[in-house]
């Protein structure tokens, strides 16, 4: 994955004069698929490199992203614990511009688990990552709007393709992201 990212950035630097750097941050709402839990709020922040102009562009990026879930009690009691999983995401998106300001995008995303904080209802915490696979693959889809003065906004959904093997259960991270950014 690291070599692929370096190659994409290198091709972009030397292959086109229509390339732009940018930064992006926003709110994330994450949950596990096929798991009895509630969504957990978090944030994401990172950068991207948009290669291309006009109708189509490739956009590799890198971002810090909070994922995870809130486990609830068996009888509908308040939240039992919050499990926050922190990842470095590396998406490679294909953007298609339908109007000068409106685009849709999709592509693969590799993620590496960098830390975890499991907060139990009794106040104790666990930071061990042994019960979770250290990487995952997802598909990303979304829609973006280019605003005046280089600003942009987007809504995206990360759909986990590969199981996180969470305590030997077949669950995947699913994340809704609302972002604002700036393109230099």
Please annotate each region the language model reported:
Residues 144-151, 172-184:
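Outer-membrane beta-barrel "beta-signal"
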Residues 27-31, 51-55, 64-68, 110-114, ...:
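Transmembrane beta-strands of outer-membrane beta-barrel pores
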Residues 41-47, 88-92, 137-143, 174-178:
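Hydrophobic, lipid-facing positions within transmembrane beta-strands of outer-membrane proteins
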Residues 17, 51-55, 96-100, 147-149, ...:
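Outer-membrane beta-barrel strand-turn architecture
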Residues 31-37, 66-86, 114-135, 163-176:
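Flexible, solvent-exposed loop segments that connect beta-strands
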Residues 21, 55-58, 102-104, 149-155:
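Repeated loop/turn-to-beta-strand initiation elements of outer-membrane beta-barrel proteins
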Residues 20-28:
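Cleaved targeting-peptide boundary
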Residues 4-13:
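Sec-dependent N-terminal signal peptides
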């Amino acid at each position: 994955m690291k070599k692929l990212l370096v190659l994409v950035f290198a091709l972009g630097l030397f292959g086109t004069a229509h390339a732009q750097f940018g930064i992006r941050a926003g709110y994330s709402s994450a949950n596990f698929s096929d798991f009895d839990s509630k969504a957990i709020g978090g944030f994401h922040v990172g950068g991207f490199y948009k290669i291309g102009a006009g109708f189509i562009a490739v956009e590799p990026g890198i971002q810090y992203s909070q994922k995870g879930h809130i486990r609830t009690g068996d009888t509908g009691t308040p939240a039992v614990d919050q499990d926050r999983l922190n990842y470095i995401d590396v998406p490679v998106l294909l953007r298609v511009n339908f109007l000068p300001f409106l685009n849709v995008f999709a592509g693969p995303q590799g993620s590496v688990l960098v830390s975890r904080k499991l907060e139990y209802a009794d106040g104790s915490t666990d930071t061990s990552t042994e019960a979770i696979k250290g990487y995952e693959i997802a598909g990303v889809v979304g829609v973006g709007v280019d605003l005046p003065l280089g600003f942009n906004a987007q809504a995206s959904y990360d759909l986990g393709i590969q199981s996180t093997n969470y305590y030997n259960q077949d669950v995947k991270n699913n994340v809704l992201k609302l972002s604002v950014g700036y393109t230099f």
